[in-house]
């Protein structure tokens, strides 16, 4: 089986390029949901400018409201509303793949109980809007507004925030939460600009063309041949709805997804009624620990995330002993991984009726080479007579023509082509390039210059030379499948630092040179932990398209695990000495 995995990896190691949705392709990034509203430029001052109004930006605003006396907190976002990922992603079938009771933040604070174990995109979006109302974050927000530069004014102790609307906003603090899924990317295919049919990216869904909404009902596709490039987590949710309405659906696959059972169900009213105060944080931490391989007395979430991790952990450490021969432990992990993937491959055989299609859908790689997918209707889609799987044997689509898509030497005529090809990757694309602006700190130092060879931070949050500036990302910080939980921990930490600055009468805080150096050394010490594993995976997002060593080690997440990262932040706050920071 190792040889089979190697073969599947190697036949995909042909390199894959992407085209960013900019310049001639900028139409793929335009907002189809909110009509642009013109306004006069603003020149004013705020306490905090938060760039990004997704979960990270909202939690920054919420925790600052709760922990500090700062009054004017301004969210700035290019979208037409709050929500981030959940504003942009409205495609039919969109849901979270992490349990909604632990993914949707501040449930207790807002008095919200999700309707299902795995909530729909519209429900999540509405909840994020509720958070913005609850913490009065709409009041000073600027939407449909893109930051063009952040520049520190040393004499005034303020950040100058410039935007594409001509605004000049002075802010004591800036926090950047530009997110993971806001800049769509396209496949770098010959002929991309020549396709004469209709096309769009899944994060800019064109309901005017398809009809329907996020729940389905795509009535305008009844006479359309629709193609989708990409078979990751978006297509897993989307395909059943397209198949229901399109005359013909053609899915172009480079690498099969590993699709496990979702097991969604309505929220039991009696369970919700019996929840004790603090239930959400306890549930989050329980899930966080279990999915990080840290044993717990019980599994509160009981889903495929926790159950799979438990199986792998039990195989490696059957008695809970953390010692033993590392080679034997690695072999045990590989065996358990193989058995889990065999389970998923067997599920395909049990559902998909055509043997050739079933064989093409089988994934041959380790469980966590890619983000696992969960769905109870995707595989069944391939039993429909109007659905065709075009397996490209790892080579990907060859090119586009005015009429359609060429794959495996054959042209597939299409009326509509949908790109489910993901987003600019935060580990591979320089931060300021993804952000779309540069950050100019003390003495004219540009973040693009300081980070030319990779990031340098304290705890992934603050940078020497950039006072009163906070960056939320996974770079040099904790990384976990529940992104919302990690953002919650980071924003609590951010608010704690600002509160300390305010209470102690200081004006400026930044990472010290020594503090930053010490953290960077720790990042580098642990940064190679995943490379051997990722090198044996099929090319994809996690391993830089098959070249994990091509990513700057400085752009790694904290390699000691997300549980330890959260503990590091908590111990730091408890110590109270603000180690690694300079305050003036």
Curated annotation (Swiss-Prot):
Coiled-coil residue spans: none
Sites where the protein binds FAD: 55-56, 77-78, 85-86, 97-98, 103, 147, 486
Keywords on record: Antibiotic biosynthesis, FAD, Flavoprotein, Monooxygenase, NADP, Oxidoreductase
SUPFAM superfamilies per record: FAD/NAD(P)-binding domain
Enzyme class: oxidoreductase
Any Gene Ontology biological process: pentalenolactone biosynthetic process
Catalysis: reaction(s): 1-deoxy-11-oxopentalenate + NADPH + O2 + H(+) = pentalenolactone D + NADP(+) + H2O
Site, as annotated: Transition state stabilizer: 371
Gene name of the encoded protein: penE
EC number of this enzyme: 1.14.13.170
Pfam families: NAD_binding_8 (PF13450)
Top-level taxon of origin: Bacteria
Cofactors: FAD
Role this protein plays: Catalyzes the flavin-dependent Baeyer-Villiger oxidation of 1-deoxy-11-oxopentalenic acid to pentalenolactone D in the biosynthesis of pentalenolactone antibiotic.
Pathway stated in the Swiss-Prot or TrEMBL entry: Antibiotic biosynthesis; pentalenolactone biosynthesis
Name of this protein: Pentalenolactone D synthase
Keyword presence, Signal: no
Family the entry assigns: Belongs to the FAD-binding monooxygenase family.
């Amino acid at each position: 089986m190792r040889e089979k995995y190697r073969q599947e990896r190697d036949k995909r190691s042909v390199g894959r390029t992407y085209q960013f949705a900019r310049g001639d392709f900028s139409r793929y990034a335009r907002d189809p949901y909110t009509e642009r509203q013109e306004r006069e430029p603003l020149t004013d001052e705020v306490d905090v400018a938060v760039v990004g109004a997704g979960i990270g930006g909202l939690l920054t605003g919420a925790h600052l409201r709760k922990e500090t006396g700062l009054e004017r907190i301004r969210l700035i976002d290019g979208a037409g509303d709050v929500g981030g990922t959940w504003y942009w992603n409205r495609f039919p079938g969109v849901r979270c793949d992490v349990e909604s009771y632990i993914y949707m933040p501040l449930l207790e604070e807002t008095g919200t109980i999700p309707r299902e174990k795995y909530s729909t995109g519209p429900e999540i979006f509405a909840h994020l809007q509720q958070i913005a109302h609850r913490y009065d974050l709409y009041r000073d927000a600027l939407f449909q507004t893109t930051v063009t530069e952040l520049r520190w004014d040393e004499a005034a102790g303020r950040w100058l925030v410039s935007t594409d609307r001509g605004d000049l906003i002075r802010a004591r603090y800036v926090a950047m939460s530009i997110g993971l899924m806001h800049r769509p990317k396209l496949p770098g295919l010959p002929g991309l600009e020549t396709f004469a049919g209709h096309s769009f990216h899944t994060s800019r869904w064109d309901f005017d063309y398809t009809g329907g909404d996020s729940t389905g009902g795509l009535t305008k596709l009844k006479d359309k041949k629709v193609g989708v490039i990409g078979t990751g987590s978006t297509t897993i949710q989307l395909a059943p709805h397209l198949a229901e309405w399109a005359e013909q659906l053609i899915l172009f696959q480079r690498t099969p997804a590993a699709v496990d059972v979702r097991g969604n169900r309505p929220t039991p009213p009696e369970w919700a009624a019996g929840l004790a105060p603090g239930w959400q944080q306890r549930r989050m931490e329980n899930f966080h620990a279990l999915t990080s391989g840290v044993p717990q007395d019980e599994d509160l979430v009981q889903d495929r995330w926790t159950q799979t991790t438990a199986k792998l952990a039990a195989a490696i450490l059957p008695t809970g002993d953390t010692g033993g021969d590392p080679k034997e432990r690695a072999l045990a992990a590989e065996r358990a991984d193989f058995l889990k993937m065999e389970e998923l491959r067997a599920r395909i055989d049990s559902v998909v009726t055509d043997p050739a299609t079933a064989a093409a859908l089988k994934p041959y790689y380790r469980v966590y080479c890619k983000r696992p997918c969960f769905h109870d209707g995707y595989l069944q889609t391939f039993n429909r007579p109007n659905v065709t799987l075009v397996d490209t044997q790892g080579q990907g689509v060859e090119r586009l023509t005015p009429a359609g898509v060429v794959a495996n030497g054959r042209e597939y005529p299409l009326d509509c082509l949908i790109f489910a090809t993901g987003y600019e990757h935060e580990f591979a694309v320089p931060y300021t390039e993804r952000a779309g602006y540069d950050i100019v700190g003390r003495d004219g130092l540009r973040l693009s210059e300081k980070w030319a060879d990779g990031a340098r931070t304290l705890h992934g949050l603050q940078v020497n030379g950039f006072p009163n500036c906070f960056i939320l990302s996974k770079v040099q910080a904790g990384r976990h499948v529940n992104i919302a939980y990690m953002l919650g921990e980071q924003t609590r930490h951010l608010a704690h630092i600002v509160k300390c600055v305010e209470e102690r009468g200081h004006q400026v805080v930044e990472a010290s040179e020594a503090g930053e150096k010490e953290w960077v050394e720790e990042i580098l010490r642990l940064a190679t932990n995943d490379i051997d594993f990722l090198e044996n995976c099929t090319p994809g997002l996690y391993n830089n398209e098959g070249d994990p060593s091509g990513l700057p080690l400085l752009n790694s997440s904290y390699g000691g695990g997300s549980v330890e990262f959260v503990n590091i932040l908590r111990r730091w706050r408890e110590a109270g000495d603000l180690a690694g920071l300079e305050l003036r």
